[in-house]
């Protein structure tokens, strides 16, 4: 590139973000340098602060700036229900829906032997220990409806077989307002298998 090494370094650094290629990184860098210097300074400070201060909650593995996150600190959330998700963004989506009032465990991934991700890399033993220690009565497996997410859910369920815990899986199916002609076969199959009486 025909720019300063500092500009090149900024562009390369921005490329670490998901979905950001060379051109997008250049546009971002040029915007920050041309018109957004105060925003760029705030962004740099916030990044430094977050990278230094954000850790994983000791209880659920979600992002937190304290040993125990705000959700795990609330006694009313420890109601015997534990929801297992793959990522903090999944937890956030459930929280924003506003209906679930239990606690969480964030795997920070899913099983993927091809990528070298086994049970120990995503904290399965920590999850199983927590389930037993806290007397969880219902475990909601809210992993994504992908091959890896399904495999992860089945692995966890198999490990807890015979433990007298209700193990549930989030329903999969047709989105509200969706049309059958646009739904993929995998989703349609799950919708048929998870159908319920109309009276419910």
Curated annotation (Swiss-Prot):
Domain annotation Toprim: ranges: 80-175
Family matches, as SMART domains: TOPRIM
NCBIfam families (UniProt xref): recR
GO function term, MF aspect, one: zinc ion binding
Claim: Zinc is one of the keywords in the record: yes
UniProtKB keywords: DNA damage, DNA recombination, DNA repair, Metal-binding, Zinc, Zinc-finger
Protein name, entry field: Recombination protein RecR
Native source species: Marinobacter nauticus (strain ATCC 700491 / DSM 11845 / VT8) (Marinobacter aquaeolei)
Protein's job: May play a role in DNA repair. It seems to be involved in an RecBC-independent recombinational process of DNA repair. It may act with RecF and RecO.
PANTHER family the record matches: RECOMBINATION PROTEIN RECR
Entry keyword DNA damage: yes
Similarity comment text for this entry: Belongs to the RecR family.
GO biological process, one term: DNA recombination
Residue intervals of every C4-type zinc finger in the record: 57-72
Superkingdom assignment: Bacteria
């Amino acid at each position: 590139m025909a720019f300063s090494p500092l500009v090149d370094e900024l562009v390369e650094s921005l490329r670490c973000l998901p979905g950001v290629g060379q051109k997008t990184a250049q546009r971002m860098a040029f915007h920050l340098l041309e018109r957004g210097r105060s925003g760029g300074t705030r962004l740099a400070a916030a990044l430094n602060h977050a990278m230094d201060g954000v850790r994983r909650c000791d209880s659920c593995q979600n992002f937190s700036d304290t040993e125990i996150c705000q959700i795990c600190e609330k006694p009313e959330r420890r109601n015997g229900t534990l929801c297992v998700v793959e990522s903090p963004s999944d937890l956030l989506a459930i929280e924003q829906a506003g209906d679930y009032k239990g606690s969480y465990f964030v795997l920070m991934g899913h099983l993927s032997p091809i990528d070298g991700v086994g049970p120990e890399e995503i904290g399965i033993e920590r999850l199983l220990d927590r389930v037993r220690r806290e007397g969880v009565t219902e475990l909601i497996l809210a992993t994504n409806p992908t091959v890896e997410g399904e495999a992860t859910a089945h692995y966890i369920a198999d490990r807890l077989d015979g433990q007298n815990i209700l193990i549930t899986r989030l329903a999969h199916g047709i989105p509200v307002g969706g049309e059958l002609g646009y739904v993929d076969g995998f989703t349609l199959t799950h919708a048929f298998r998870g159908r319920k009486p109309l009276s419910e």
